[in-house]
Amino acid sequence: MSQLEKIYGVHAVEALLRHHPKRVKHIWLAEGRNDPRVQTLVALASENRVTIGQAERREMDAWVEGVHQGVVADVSPSQVWGEAMLDELLDRSEGPPLLLVLDGVTDPHNLGACLRTADAAGALAVIVPKDKSATLTPAVRKVACGAAEVIPLVAVTNLARTLEKLQQRGLWVVGTAGEAEVELYQQDLTGPTIIIMGAEGKGMRRLTREHCDYLVRLPMAGSVSSLNVSVATGVCLFEALRQRSAKRKP
C-alpha cells in the first residue's frame, strides 16, 4: 500500500469525505471537540465506514505544519492530472470552457487560494508547469477549503506545447501583463478561454507570453502597482463569470 498522507482542516477533510471517500482511511479528532461541524464529519465518516479516533492536540500539532482545527485524516495519496487528461475534460465540458494557467506560482498558499477561486468561478481546471510550480500538499488543500478535491490540477511538462494544443482545439489564450494596452474589462471572455497568471514580480515567462492571443491588464486606481496573484486571479475569473452570466440572460 502506498504511504498515507495527512490532510488537515475541517473543510479539506469534509470535501474528501464527500467527493473521494475511498481515499480516507482514518480520521483523528482532537480530544473534547464535539461541535456541529465535527458531528457532520462523524456522520459522513459513518456513512462511508471510515474509522474515527481521538488524539491530543499537541500530538496533532506534531503531525502537520499548520492550523489543523482539531481534524486530521490519514488518506491515500492524490494524483495530479497529466496533460493527456485535458482532452477528456474538454470533451465533458457543457459550455465554453474556462481554464486557469498559473505560470511559475510557487507559493503553496497562493496555489490553494487560486484553486478555491477557480472552483468558485466555474473553471474547468487549473494548469501548472511541472517545474517551478507549487503542487498539491496538505497546506495547499487546507487553504483551498475543499476545492482541491473538486477541481482538477493538471501538471504539464511543456506549457508552451500544451497551450498550442489547446489553441488548436479552439481556445483563446488571454495573458495578464501590467503593461498591456487593453484592460481586463474590455476583453471578451465569453468564449472558450484560457486565462494565464504569471508569478508575482516576474509575470509570465517569455515563451508563455509569446503564445498569448491577447494581453490584458487590471486597471489600478491607487498607489500600489500590483496585486497578490491569488487576488488578481479572482478578479480575472469572476469577470469571466460575470460576462458569461450576462450573456446567458434573455
Curated annotation (Swiss-Prot):
Chief localization: cytoplasm
SMART domains: SpoU_sub_bind
Reactions catalysed, as given in the entry: guanosine(2251) in 23S rRNA + S-adenosyl-L-methionine = 2'-O-methylguanosine(2251) in 23S rRNA + S-adenosyl-L-homocysteine + H(+)
GO molecular-function term, one example from the UniProt record: RNA binding
Enzyme class: transferase
Keyword tags: Cytoplasm, Methyltransferase, rRNA processing, S-adenosyl-L-methionine, Transferase
EC id: 2.1.1.185
Disulfide-linked positions: none
UniProt: S-adenosyl-L-methionine binding residues: 198, 218, 227
Cellular component annotations (GO), alphabetically ordered: cytosol
Localization (cell): Cytoplasm
One Pfam family named in its UniProt record: SpoU_methylase
SUPFAM superfamilies hit by this protein: alpha/beta knot (SSF75217), L30e-like (SSF55315)
Keyword set includes Signal: no
Similarity-based family: Belongs to the class IV-like SAM-binding methyltransferase superfamily. RNA methyltransferase TrmH family. RlmB subfamily.
Function noted in UniProt: Specifically methylates the ribose of guanosine 2251 in 23S rRNA.
NCBIfam families reported in the protein's UniProt record: rRNA_methyl_3
Protein name as annotated: 23S rRNA (guanosine-2'-O-)-methyltransferase RlmB
Lineage: Bacteria, Pseudomonadati, Pseudomonadota, Gammaproteobacteria, Pseudomonadales
